[in-house]
Each structure stands twice: as structure tokens, then as C-alpha cells.
Amino acid sequence: MRYIVALTGGIGSGKSTVANAFADLGINVIDADIIARQVVEPGAPALHAIADHFGANMIAADGTLQRRALRERIFANPEEKNWLNALLHPLIQQETQHQIQRATSPYVLWVVPLLVENSLYKKANRVLVVDVSPETQLKRTMQRDDVTREHVEQILAAQATREARLAVADDVIDNNGAPDAIASDVARLHAYYLQLASQFVSQEKP
């Protein structure tokens, strides 16, 4: 068994920056979003299933998934969203387990944007939340993605609340300030997680 630290945060919170800081310290990072893209790569069985269910127009000329079109299709249709989740979630879970088993670092950092929404925090040994104010989320996401405030507000409304994320957190990184502060926070937590992982391994041994 591998000690798992789940990392989450709302859109624009800086999850990638924090994950990269852990990776720089030699920790294997398993990113749920990357895995979700991998299972629908051109030629993947799941991509064919999506095309069969939603129509061939969901596939671009280069064979890739038309993500925006699919998002728009399921956004206001719970039944279609449930169908897609039933298809993809088992595949994502399977690949996640494979990557955890292949990990070589003392603990793994599992990056899951929808950790709270899908109750996945129960699968982790510890939960780290990257926390920022909603206003910071709005500004960063508008700047990064070149989208309107209204668009970001819709995304925020569909995600778990800040309070819900903090309620499941074991550790919190406040990312409202300068990016430089992240490195020291990550270094401190890394040292702590190494201790926890070592204790976990010793308890697992017969």
C-alpha cells in the first residue's frame, strides 16, 4: 500500500503550481484530469463509445474529442452526464490504481479537482486543500482562460463550496499571496508527509 495525499482546490486556486512544487521534490504526482484525458485519447474504446452515444460530431477531424461540445451537451442534462460518468469513472479509477502501484516515491500526491463533489477524499490517507478567496479564483481564471466573469461564476456555482473543501481538509495551503510562499509551505508539508508515510509503512508490515 502507498500513502496517498489528495490535493484539491477550486478552479484558479493554484493546484498545478502546488503539485509541481511537490514533483520538484521527487514526489510522484497522479493527476485525475490528465488521466481523464488519457482514457479518451484517439483510438481509445471510451472515445468510440462517446461517439456512438452522442454522435460522430463529438469527434474532431483529427480524431480527438470535442470537449467543449461534450461539456455543453451534458451541462444541462443530468441523465447524459450520469451516462458519461458511468463510462469514464471506472476507467479513470483503474488507471489511477495502476499509477499508484507503479509509484516509487515514499508517498504519492493525487490531484483531484472534484475530490469533494465525488466523495473521493475517503480514498486518501490525507487531504491537502489549496485555498484562495472566490474573488482571487475569478480574477485568476478570467486572466488565464480569457473568459468572462459570468462564465467563471457559473463554474464556481457548479463546484463544491470553499467551506465544503475546507471541511474535509487535513492541511491547507493559503495561496492568496505571493507565489514564493508556496515553496516553503510545500517543503514543510513534504517533511511531515515523509514522516506520516514512514509510520504508515511500518504499521502495514506484519
UniProtKB/Swiss-Prot annotation:
GO terms for biological process: coenzyme A biosynthetic process. It catalyses: 3'-dephospho-CoA + ATP = ADP + CoA + H(+). Its main location: cytoplasm. Residues 4-200 form the DPCK domain. CDD domains: DPCK. ATP binds at residues 12-17. Pathway: Cofactor biosynthesis; coenzyme A biosynthesis; CoA from (R)-pantothenate: step 5/5. It is an enzyme of class 2 (transferase). GO terms for cellular component: cytoplasm. Its EC number is 2.7.1.24. Pfam families: CoaE. Keywords: ATP-binding, Coenzyme A biosynthesis, Cytoplasm, Kinase, Nucleotide-binding, Transferase. PROSITE patterns: DPCK. NCBIfam families: dephospho-CoA kinase. Belongs to the CoaE family. Catalyzes the phosphorylation of the 3'-hydroxyl group of dephosphocoenzyme A to form coenzyme A. PANTHER family: BIFUNCTIONAL COENZYME A SYNTHASE-RELATED, DEPHOSPHO-COA KINASE-RELATED. This is Dephospho-CoA kinase. The lineage of its organism: Bacteria, Pseudomonadati, Pseudomonadota, Gammaproteobacteria, Enterobacterales.
